Amino acid sequence: MSKIDSIIEMIEGLNVLELVELKKKMEEKWGVTAAAPVMAMGAAMPVAAAGDGAAAAAPVEEKTEFDVILKEAGPNKIQVIKVVRELTSLGLKEAKDLVEGAPKPVREGVSKEEAEAAKAKLTEAGAVVEIK
């Protein structure tokens, strides 16, 4: 029998209070925690309480405002500048600076439909676009 197997057998023989004490001592000794890792940006779904049973999950908020981000102008920079001017009402110099300074937001806080339309126009002109 290996050391690991004998340790497992010893742990199996412990009661709940002894297991809690073992956990605390391991956390103190090695500076670790037995807590479950927390997922970033709310990726983990909320879990219903054990005794509750009828607890509903929190409703997921649907995003209503989107940003259109120009990642790169692509080979047709002049066409992209024209589309940026059309979408933003910027002057020629400002639109050129925006396109050359990519990645930059072209439209911010717009509806999904407006964001999709802007992305379609920019992509048609040869730009690489992302909606956030």
UniProtKB/Swiss-Prot annotation:
GO terms for cellular component: cytosolic large ribosomal subunit. InterPro entries: Ribosomal_bL12 (IPR000206), Ribosomal_bL12_C (IPR013823), Ribosomal_bL12_C/ClpS-like (IPR014719), Ribosomal_bL12_oligo (IPR008932), Ribosomal_bL12_oligo_N_sf (IPR036235). It comes from the Bacteria. One of its GO terms (biological process) is translation. GO terms for molecular function: mRNA binding; structural constituent of ribosome. The keyword Membrane does not apply. Keywords: Ribonucleoprotein, Ribosomal protein. HAMAP family: Ribosomal_bL12 (MF_00368). Homodimer. Part of the ribosomal stalk of the 50S ribosomal subunit. Forms a multimeric L10(L12)X complex, where L10 forms an elongated spine to which 2 to 4 L12 dimers bind in a sequential fashion. Binds GTP-bound translation factors. Forms part of the ribosomal stalk which helps the ribosome interact with GTP-bound translation factors. Is thus essential for accurate translation. Belongs to the bacterial ribosomal protein bL12 family. This is Large ribosomal subunit protein bL12. It comes from Chloroflexus aurantiacus (strain ATCC 29366 / DSM 635 / J-10-fl). The lineage of its organism: Bacteria, Bacillati, Chloroflexota, Chloroflexia, Chloroflexales. The gene is rplL.
